[in-house]
């Protein structure tokens, strides 16, 4: 699991779900409490790649509370057989800068694909 370091005194942390090249699909973004099976209030967040709405989500404040929490992104994509592969990314931002990214490449030739991306948030940027 990738660890992403953030500043407790910086701006609000956000998580974005990206797919390149554009594909049909949806996702669920979960923010897990540190060392428990409980989700943070307000999580999960849902979205899909079929509209122009943003797929960026602001995490709750204060930032210090995010230390040790886990972000899990569950993605389902439909890939027509003639379409080339795609890359799905979970991008973590703070103060307008990318502070971390976890990504997976999807193999060619699959019609439907599910994947999970995990990131642990740690203070100390």
Q: What are these model-predicted stretches?
A:
Residues 1-43, 49-70, 76-125:
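Beta-strand-rich recognition domains
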């Amino acid at each position: 699991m990738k660890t992403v370091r953030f500043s407790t005194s910086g701006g609000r942390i956000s998580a974005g779900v990206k797919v390149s090249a554009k594909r049909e699909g949806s996702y669920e973004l979960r923010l897990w409490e540190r060392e428990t099976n409980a989700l943070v209030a307000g999580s999960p967040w849902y979205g899909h790649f079929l509209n122009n709405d943003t797929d960026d989500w602001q995490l709750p404040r204060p930032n210090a509370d995010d230390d040790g929490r886990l972000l899990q992104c569950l993605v389902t994509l439909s890939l027509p057989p003639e379409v080339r592969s795609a890359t799905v990314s979970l991008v973590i931002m703070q103060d307008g800068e990318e502070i971390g990214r976890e990504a997976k490449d999807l193999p060619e030739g699959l019609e439907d694909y599910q994947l999970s991306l995990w990131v642990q948030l740690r203070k100390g940027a």
